[in-house]
Regions:
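Short beta-strand-to-loop elements that line the ligand-binding cleft
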Residues: 13, 37-39, 59, 181-186
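Extracytoplasmic "Venus flytrap"
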Residues: 16-19, 148-176, 180-204, 208-218
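Short beta-strand elements at the ligand-binding edges of bilobed clamshell
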Residues: 52-63, 183
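Hinge/cleft segment of the Venus flytrap/periplasmic-binding protein
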Residues: 68, 72-148
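Sec-exported extracytoplasmic/periplasmic mature domains
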Residues: 4-8, 26-30, 51, 55, ...
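Hydrophobic alpha-helical
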Residues: 1-48, 207-226
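Short, solvent-exposed loop/turn elements at domain surfaces
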Residues: 47, 124-129, 159-164
């Protein structure tokens, strides 16, 4: 591409903020030229490419991200403490380790999955990016956590990480948490592409909203207030 044509031998290392671009550079130029290339997301193709010389990537702990997304909803629906099944074991035995798997910010009232470096030494542990995390893989009792219906959107259905890793993980967790989820994929450009498919909010018990632009919350809350 343009960078290799312009700089060629001057490029010593390639660092990308996502594996989609990192792998494009690796396959098109860096692999043959033996230039170390690093990405972010730990997508399955990038992890597999480490065996072929891809320098490494960063796992966002997507398995924890997806679990936290649905677990916070599940806890709210069940009327239990928000930390249930997260930092505090639930009755099934699901429990994460704070400081290793996630951190919690009381000020921001937010859970954050913690990043993990994926290298030649440990990449084989990350070859299946859609595998549920063992620590939180136990089925909930449907008599205590009955099936609920959730509307969940992903702002860009074409995003590599969201479509190939995050959504498949959500789909693997929703059954374990007794959630029937309708997944809505946006175009990554306009809020209306998503909100146009929220015409019947009364049909759902909970909503997980991933906005295209972070200042467009009113586009959704206006619909939910009807």
């Amino acid at each position: 591409g343009t960078w290799t044509a312009s700089f060629g031998d001057q490029i010593d290392v390639v660092v990308s903020n996502n594996d989609g671009m990192g792998m494009s550079m690796f396959n098109a130029w860096a692999k043959d030229n033996k230039v170390p290339t690093f990405g972010y997301d730990a997508n399955s193709d990038a992890v597999a490419a480490i065996a072929e010389g891809y320098g490494g990537t960063i796992s966002q702990h997507a398995d924890v991200q997806a679990y936290l997304t649905l677990r916070v909803l599940r806890n709210a629906l069940d009327g239990v403490d928000v930390d249930t099944g997260i930092g505090t074991a639930d009755e099934a035995g699901n429990c994460l380790t704070e400081g290793e798997d996630y951190r919690y910010s009381e000020e921001e009232r937010s859970y954050y999955a913690l990043n993990v470096a994926v290298t030649a030494e440990n990449y084989q542990d990350f070859t299946d990016s859609t595998k549920v995390y063992d620590k939180v893989s136990k089925q909930l009792d449907s008599s205590k956590s009955p099936t609920k219906k959730v509307w969940l959107d992903i702002y860009n259905a074409s995003d590599n990480f969201l479509s190939s890793t995050y959504q498949p993980l959500l789909e693997n967790y929703d059954d374990l948490l007794n959630l029937k989820v309708d997944y809505i994929g946006g175009d990554g450009q306009t809020e209306s592409n998503i909100t146009n498919r929220l015409g019947n909010p009364g049909e759902y018990d909970a909503f997980a909203i991933n906005m295209v632009k972070t200042d467009n919350a009113a586009s959704y809350t206006t619909l939910l207030n009807k």
